[in-house]
Amino acid sequence: MAMRNLLFWFALLTGGPAMAMEISSTAFGPGAPIPTRHTCEGNDVSPSLHWQGVPAGAKSLVLIVDDPDAPDPRAPRMTWVHWVLANLPVDTGGLPEGIETAALPKGTVEGLNDWKRTGYGGPCPPIGRHRYFHKLYALDVVLGGLKHPTKAQVEAAMKGHVLAHAELVGTYEKAGR
């Protein structure tokens, strides 16, 4: 009973239990199809993304969007990287639809996707319905020495510095496939 009382008072005095970090989009829900406008068959613009629950002590955020089902979800051989952003400010709260490089929050570093260019590259699966993971990481550091890093370079730099992780998964299959 004493422990329960202690936990109650701790939660009350600290503002309640810590909220888990979450990422969401107004364009699609968890497990739902990604609208065509965000794909190679549409305007190829990034979806709006929103997050909350970034933990205290976080110094930067990393966003990675990738597809583990490439090239064929029945026999995946690789993970295709669609977007890499590092050093997003922790107070950002999200990104609007179709954000351009010049409009990214100050300090954000754009990494290379698997088309060997920076910026968002939307879903464009050659075969079948693929899953697209929008992964957000809260780090206890601002990553240094990055200039157009690959996903692998960002993941290596953030190793041991992840405070929290959230993900949103959407799907896409080309019309008539």
Question: Which ranges hold each PLM region?
Answer:
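Bacterial N-terminal signal peptides
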Residues: 5-17
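N-terminus-centered regions that define maturation/targeting leaders and the start
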Residues: 19-177
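N-terminal secretory signal peptides that target proteins for export/translocation
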Residues: 1-3
